[in-house]
Structures are given as structure tokens and as C-alpha cells.
Amino acid sequence: MQFSYSWLKTQADTELSADKLEHLLTMSGLEVEEAETAAPAFTGVVIAEVKSVEKHPDADRLNVTQVDAGTGELVQIVCGAPNVKAGIKVPCSLPGAVLLGNFKIKLTKMRGVVSNGMLCSTDELGLPDDGVNGLHILPQDAPVGTNIREYLDLDDTVFTLKITPNRADCLSIKGIAREVSALTGCAFKQPAIHAAPIAGSRKQPVQIDAPADCGRFISRVIENVNARAATPDWMKQRLERSGIRSISALVDIGNYVMLEIGQPMHVFDADKLSGSLHIRRAREGETLECLNEKTVSLSENTLVVADEKGVLSLAGLMGGAASAVSDDTQNIVLEAAWFAPEIIAGKSRQYGFGSDSSFRFERGVDYRLQADAIERATELVLQICGGAAGEMVEAQGELPEAKQVELRLGRLKTVLGVDIPAEQVKTILQHLGLQPEKTAEGFRVTAPSFRFDIEIEADLIEEIGRVYGYENIPDDYTSGRLKMLALPETRRPRFAVYNEMAARGYREVVSYAFVDEQWEHDFAANANPIRLQNPLAAQYAVMRSTLIGGLVEILQNNLNRKQNRVRVFEIARVFSKGSDDRFVQNERIGGLWYGAAMPEQWGEKTRNADFYDIKADVENLLKNKAVEFVKTEHPALHPGRAANIVSDGQVIGFVGELHPKWLQKYDLPQAPLVFEIDMAAVLEREKTRYQAVSKFQPVRRDLAFVMPETMTHDDLLAALNGAANKLVQEISVFDVYRGTGLPEGMKSMAVKVILQDMENTLTDETVEPVIGKLIDAATAAGAQLRS
């Protein structure tokens, strides 16, 4: 929000210096990004009237002028501007003046003719371009001899504020003045709104077909206007110092009212409209050529203003070229509306352009301001362009309901740490336009129509704090009781997981939750992902249901930077659709390993990491849980090198090698290994229980079984563990053999069996029956003891 201090003072009767106001606004939460004078520093420039002009005797492009600069006698100045002529009033720098760049004016000769100064253009004074090739021509009533800085108020300060999205009420002079009044106690002088005399007969019918999107729409026809009328200099100056270029009187008036009171407006050429105005959603196939000369194809989630023939404007964003006013316009329709922020939000990104109107509408405009805006704009149109105003036509849809918020003085003291008297609290609320009602514990406030951000008690506490002044709150130590939350033995601390991954050589990464829809198809086989209504970009159109896509992208970035060994992990949320189309978000940990199993060294041959390397990392991560790995198929993973991670019969994640078909698509020289696990399962751990250590020696038996290639080691171990009794402490595979001596399609798998008793030394008589049951179980499962 950019504005001049002089304009602000018309509504806030403050005598603060510009520096003090800058500090006050910033400390109250309205950050001042920039504060500078309306024009760069220069001295010695006055208003002069050109009395006569003669051609230079020795230069075709120069003129010799006699000017009255208020010195009591005419001053001769040589001038080369093409628009110099007798009778005009212009800025004049006399000898001793200092212009931009420390350019000093002194008496000089130009082609033999004495020149006692210089007549100036806007460029030479650092003023906004007036579109004139030559001297800056001033109004005829400009007083000769007056300092130009004083006449044009060039020492005025122009403020640029960084308004946060919740403070749309401060996107106008009226809103800023209200704030200054609350902060300083100065008088708040609201712009006077006068009902226009009704002299015209035409009305513009209005119909709201989307009442949830448009709460109010007001139109007024003004007939017989002079569209060629010049915008007054005072209005031009205020617009220019607010960063808005003057276009034409009718357009300037709409912009002026928006800046003055905060209501965006639009002006239609009434003779280019057909029938009633309809506020509705766009229809399939509709297009619009906008005022910026861009033609856009409209989506059905876009609100438009249309007549009987078609779309006239993008509601709250930009008008259409076909219904725009021009120098030939004779009759106009003024529009002031309230559009729901939700329907305007994101449209600037969607269509690739925005406007001052959309900037305000998507943040929220006062829904009681529209009639005042029409009356104010009408007053200015009649004053500048003439015409006859007709009656206002108003249509109403669904408007927001005013919210009531309770403020407890005790809570205010607890949060701010300072005891502010109730009467002072009441005064602050009144100055902010929040009419307070006394209650037993404090005040009840009904949020005004211009404050969408007042919803809960904390909002009121913030308002009191910033107006009271954060600098006025004493630097006392706050005290309070902190209760430590007990961490049960069955839960690991989160930092332990991060430390565990770092200890295994993984680096933490963070990726976007918004991902490319193709990733969801490739890595999760998700044909119906959660789509964003207003994505930041096409490649961030959906919410992720897996972390794999982000990890693969990070791998690509590292490979592009010549990193040939990458191990990364991420702990983040993934999103999916639950029952009744509700969204579910779960936290997961994902990891990726690419490249060599070990860093290059002399003591170990280089080999690429494989499934068992990353499986070992997963086992280490889940060492406090009993888990098993079950062969599976997953859209992201190699068909023969993928496993589900199962705990207590529930699948808690997966691990494996990336599918070969994705290597070429994602430009990967070799396959990375990945895993993804529910974070809740990772944080769980089984309670540690005491287990006595046997003082008797263990007994080991090695068994080799011949089995079909289709039989997995999990099948064998499941059969053996099912037949084991309490003497069996461990069963594990230690060798697999294929080749000579075995029938085709068969393999040999050797297992070790560790037996131990807590009370006795084991004998063959005790061990052999146990081993026999294990052999029988393996035989029943399809494996034969190898002889």
C-alpha cells in the first residue's frame, strides 16, 4: 500500500513527523518498507511566466525567452524545449539553483547569447513523466515566484507499507487513518459521503445468480458525461504518489475511490451493455478479451459479470475490453460489489495477471461499503465530467455474519504481562472501530464489517497489545508452571530416529508436499490423487501420497552435481482420501540409497549397494520391534526385489529396489534402493523385559535342506519356527547352494539351530527329538533333508 502523507492528513488530524509516523506504524504491525520524499532533493526552482519568445540568432533549435520569475525584472533564458511559448507558466531554476546530480545553475552563454537560468521539464526535477515532450507546464493560476517544492508539495513523504494478508482494511487511506487515530488519539475524519441528486431516468438491472460468491452488487447509470474531461491535478498527484498512473478521468475516479475508502470499482460504457447484468459462474467455452489486451479462456470456477450477450468482466479481477469506457463514451454504469474472498483467491495466478482490485477482494473488502463508494464516485463524476445520475440498483446475495468475541481482562494481563486499565482497553477498542460492550470479565466485541481477522480472543489481545505499544510493555521475566510430558517406555523419542539415520550415513532432506501428478501414477499407482484448486505451478498440482517421488527428484539433483553416492531420508506427511472423501494425512519416513555400498577405499572392493544393504538399515531402524519382510509387488519397485515390512500382522511399510522401467524415464544410471515406513510404527518399541542368561552351554546343529527354487527361505523358517519348542533359541539361514549335485530347479539351504536350556546341560537324548520335529516340519513344507 503506497500513499502520501499529505493525503493521509486529510483523514487523520495528526501532527507527527514523517519519521515518527514511520516508526509508529512499523511498531504497530504495519511495516513501512519505504518512506521517501515525493521528489528528489533540489533547490532554487521557482514558478516563472514566459513573457516572450524569440528565435536564437545563431541556433535553429534554440529560443531566447524573457520570463517573469518574481524577481522584479524580466530574466533572459535560452531554452531548447519545443513547447515553449509566451503565456505559459513553468518551473525555472535561476543562478545558484542546484538540480539533480548536484547540477549547479549559473549564468552562461549559449551560442553567444547570455542565459540567466534554465526552464525545467519533469525529468530534470525528478517528477513523474507527464507525457509532454518539453517543459513541465503548470496551471495558469500558479503564483509567479513561488518555490516549486512548496507549490507542488514536493517535500511530502510517500510511504510504502507491507500489509499482511489479514489486514485488508488497511489497503486504503481510510483504513490507515483509522489506525493512526487509534495509535495517536488524533481525530479520525472520515470522507464525507453525500447522496447524489437524482436527475437521470436510466437504471441498470442487476441479478445475482451466484449468491454464495457475490453478497452485494450495486449499479448506477450516469448519463451525458464528458469522458474527455481532464483529471484534476490534485487527483493526479494523489494517484501518482500512490503508484497509479493517470489514464482518464472516469478510470481515475474509480481508482481514486478505491484508494480513498477501500472499495474497488468498475466503470462500464452503458451503451455497450445489453439487458440486465448477471453475476454468475463462467460457462464452458466462454472467453474474454480483458483490458490488458489478453484473451483468456474461462474456467467454470471463475465468477464473471455478464449481460444477455456474454461475459463483460472477470469479477473482482479485470474488466473486458468490449464494455470499457473511451473518449467517446456518453453514458456510464458505475459498479461496486462485494465478492467472497474465496472465489477471487488464486485467480490472478490462474490467469497470469492481477490487479489492485483482485489484491483487495481476495483479502476481503468491507461488505457495507458499496453504497458509499457509489455515492462518492458519483459525486466526483458529476464534479469532473458532469452528467445526470440515476437511482442506484442493488442486488444482494449471501453476506458474512458479524462475529462476537469475548475479551477477558485477566487473560489480557496474562498474555501481555502488563495490567492495562479497563477504561484504556475500552478506548483502544473504540478507536479501532470495535464497539465494546462491558461484561463481567471484560468486554464483548462485535467484529465490524471491515475486520475479517477478528475471530477469537487472541485477535483482540493482539489489537490491544500493538495499539498500547509493545515498547510500553515492561521487560519482566514471565513465570509459569511447566509440566513435563512423560515419554512411555513403549515410545522412542523422535530425535533418536534422526540420530539413528544420521549415524547410518543418511542426510535429512525436505521436499514439497505438492508434487507432479505423474509421480503419483508412477510411484503409487494413484489414479485419483488429491488435486489442488489453485496450484503454484503445473508440476505442483497434487498432494503426495508417497515420499518416493521427492526422494528421486533429490537424487536427480545430486547426480546433476556429480554426486555418485547418495543416501538421504525425509520424515514428512503424506496425504490420501479416506472414507466419505475425507482427507487423511499420515507421517512417514522415507529413505533412498544410491551408489556404492561403502565409500571408495583400499581395504574393500567397490560394489553397489543391494537390497540386503538397505534392508539392514531398515532392520536397524526397527530394532526395537519384531518385524518380518514379506515379498510383495509395488508400482515403484523391482518385481523381484521388493518386500512389505510387517509388524503384528500389519503392513507398516515397504523396502526394495526402484523398478527398472523408471530408470530411463527419470534418467538414472542405476537403480536406487528405497524404503518408506509409517512413522508411528517407527516410534513404537516393545517394552524391555528382563531375561535370565543360561549358565549352561548352547548346542548347535546344522541342517541342510533341498527344496524347489520357488520355495523361499521365509517358507522354510516359518515351518521350522512353527515346530520349535522352548529349547530352540535361534534358527537362521547361513548358506544357499545351487549347482552340481542338485536336480534342476532345486537349491540347498543350510540353517543353524541353537538350542539351550536354563536348568540343565543338554544331551543328545534331549536334542535329537527336537531336531526330528524340525526335520518333519520342513519335510511337510516341501523341503528334504540333504544327505
Regions found by a protein language model. Name each.
Residues 1-200, 333, 352, 356, ...:
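Phosphate-backbone binding interfaces of nucleic-acid-interacting proteins
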Residues 4-5, 23, 63, 184, ...:
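Glycine/proline-enriched, intrinsically flexible loops and inter-domain linkers
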Residues 180, 184-209, 385-412, 418-419:
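Terminal amphipathic helices with adjacent charged low-complexity linkers/tails
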